[in-house]
A protein has these predicted regions:
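Flexible inter-repeat linkers and adjacent short helices
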Residues: 1-94, 109, 269, 273, ...
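Alpha-solenoid helical repeat architecture
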Residues: 7-11, 46-51, 85-92, 123-132, ...
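Residue at a conserved register position within TPR or TPR-like alpha-solenoid repeats
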Residues: 22, 62, 94, 101, ...
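Structural motif corresponding to the intra-repeat A-B loop/turn of tetratricopeptide repeats
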Residues: 25, 65, 104, 141, ...
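Amphipathic alpha-helical segments of tetratricopeptide repeats
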Residues: 36-43, 75-83, 111-120, 152-163, ...
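Long, mid-chain structured domain cores
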Residues: 49, 56-149, 153-154
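Loop-centered beta-sheet repeat module
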Residues: 148, 152-219
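C-terminal structural cap/anchor segments
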Residues: 257-294
Length: 350
C-alpha cells in the first residue's frame, strides 16, 4: 500500500522543495521567510522521513548563512539520532556534511563526503548543483583536471535544465581553473561569458556579476596588468551586494600600491584593516597588516611577515603559507641570505 499524505504533508513537502531551490540560488531573504514558515508548520507533520528532510535542510540553511557552529551542532544532533534514512535523505546528509567541511576549508574531507553523496543522487536536475560543488572542492584542493571535468559535467546539466545561475557559476569556475594553469586567453573568454550571463537585477545575479569582476581583476593581477586589475577590483568592491568584499578590497589595495597610487591605496587599506578587525576576521587582519609592511612600514617587514606566516601555518592555510613563504624566499635570495631563503623555500612546499 502506498503512503497516504495529508494536504498538510503535501504542502509541507512542496515548501521544503521551494526552500532547497532558493538556497541553491543563494537567495537568503526568500530562504529566511521559508525557514520561518517551515518552523511553524513542522509541529503538524507526522511523517518522520519528511521531518528528517526538514532537519537536514535546516542544516543546509545555516551553511548558506555561514553559521558553521550552528550547522555543526545541528549535524551532531542529527547523527546522534541514529535515524534510518531514505535515499534522498542519505544524499542530503552526505552532501550537506561535505558542505560544512568545505566552508571550514577542509577540502579533502569535503571531497570524501561529496563522493559518498554521489552514490545516492537520483534526480538529474540536482546534478547541476552537485557537480558544481564537487568541481569547486577539487579546485580548492588543487586538482584542476578533476575540477574542469566536473564543472563541464555540471554545465551540461545546467544547460539542459536552463539553470542560468549555475551556468554562470560554472563558467566562473572554469575560468579560474584556466587561470590556475596560466591559460589566460581561455580564462578571459570564460569570465566574460559568465559576466554576460547576468542580465537580471536580483541580489543573487548582482553578487555573481561582482564575482565575475573580481575574477577578471585576478586574471589581470596575475599577469601584472595592475591598472586593468584596479578597474575590475574597484567594480567588485563597489557592487551591492558583494559577498567577497574583503578579498576584493585586499587585491584592490595591493594593485593600487603596485601602480604607485599610494594615497588611494592607503584609503582602501584603512577601510580593509578596520573592517577585518570589526568582523574579527584574523585571516584578513594579517593579510592587510603584511601588505602594509610590504609597501609602507618596510622596516618591520621581516618580523611581521614571519609572524603572519606562522599564523597561517597554525591554521593549516597551505595556500597562504605557500604564497607568503615563496615571497620571503625570493626576498632573502635577493638579499644574499641563503640560509633564510632556503628555509622559506622549504616551507613553501610544505
Amino acid at each position: 500500500m502506498g503512503l497516504v499524505l495529508s494536504v498538510t504533508d503535501k504542502d509541507f513537502s512542496e515548501l521544503l522543495q521551494d526552500f532547497y531551490d532558493v538556497m541553491k540560488q543563494e537567495k537568503q531573504e526568500e530562504a529566511a521567510m521559508l525557514a520561518d514558515i517551515i518552523d511553524t508548520m513542522k509541529k503538524d507533520i507526522g511523517i518522520e522521513e519528511v521531518l528528517l528532510k526538514a532537519d537536514l535542510l535546516t542544516i543546509r540553511y545555516h551553511v548558506m548563512l555561514g553559521e558553521l557552529l550552528t550547522a555543526g551542532y545541528l549535524l551532531d544532533q542529527f547523527e546522534a539520532g541514529g535515524h534510518f534514512l531514505s535515499q534522498q535523505n542519505e544524499y542530503f546528509y552526505q552532501y550537506f556534511k561535505g558542505q560544512v567541511h568545505f566552508k571550514n576549508k577542509r577540502w579533502n574531507e569535503a571531497l570524501r563526503y561529496y563522493e559518498h553523496a554521489e552514490l545516492y543522487i537520483s534526480e538529474d536536475e540536482e546534478k547541476t548543483d552537485f557537480y558544481y560543488k564537487l568541481a569547486h572542492a577539487y579546485y580548492r584542493a588543487g586538482i584542476p583536471v578533476l575540477s574542469v571535468l566536473n564543472a563541464n559535467k555540471a554545465m551540461r546539466y545546467a544547460t539542459s535544465y536552463k539553470q542560468h545561475y549555475h551556468l554562470a557559476k560554472c563558467k566562473l569556475l572554469l575560468g579560474l581553473n584556466h587561470l590556475e594553469i596560466r591559460n589566460f586567453e581561455q580564462a578571459e573568454s570564460l569570465l566574460y561569458e559568465a559576466l554576460d550571463c547576468q542580465h537580471n537585477t536580483d541580489e543573487t545575479s548582482l553578487d555573481l556579476a561582482s564575482m565575475a569582476h573580481h575574477n577578471l581583476g585576478l586574471l589581470y593581477f596575475v599577469q601584472q596588468k595592475f591598472e586593468k586589475a584596479v578597474d575590475y577590483f574597484d567594480q567588485a568592491v563597489h557592487a551591492t551586494p558583494c559577498s567577497h568584499y574583503l578579498k576584493s578590497l585586499y587585491y584592490l589595495t595591493e594593485s593600487l600600491f603596485r601602480v604607485n597610487h599610494h594615497s588611494e591605496a592607503m584609503k582602501y587599506f584603512q577601510i580593509g584593516f578596520t573592517r577585518s578587525k570589526k568582523e574579527q576576521d584574523m585571516d584578513y587582519q594579517w593579510a592587510f597588516a603584511m601588505l602594509h609592511k610590504q609597501f609602507v612600514d618596510c622596516d618591520n617587514f621581516e618580523a611581521v611577515w614571519a609572524e603572519g606566516i606562522a599564523y597561517y601555518e597554525a591554521i593549516d592555510d597551505r595556500y597562504s603559507v605557500h604564497h607568503y613563504s615563496l615571497c620571503m624566499a625570493d626576498y632573502y635570495t635577493l638579499k644574499g641570505e641563503e640560509e633564510k631563503a632556503n628555509y622559506y623555500y622549504r616551507l613553501a612546499v610544505w
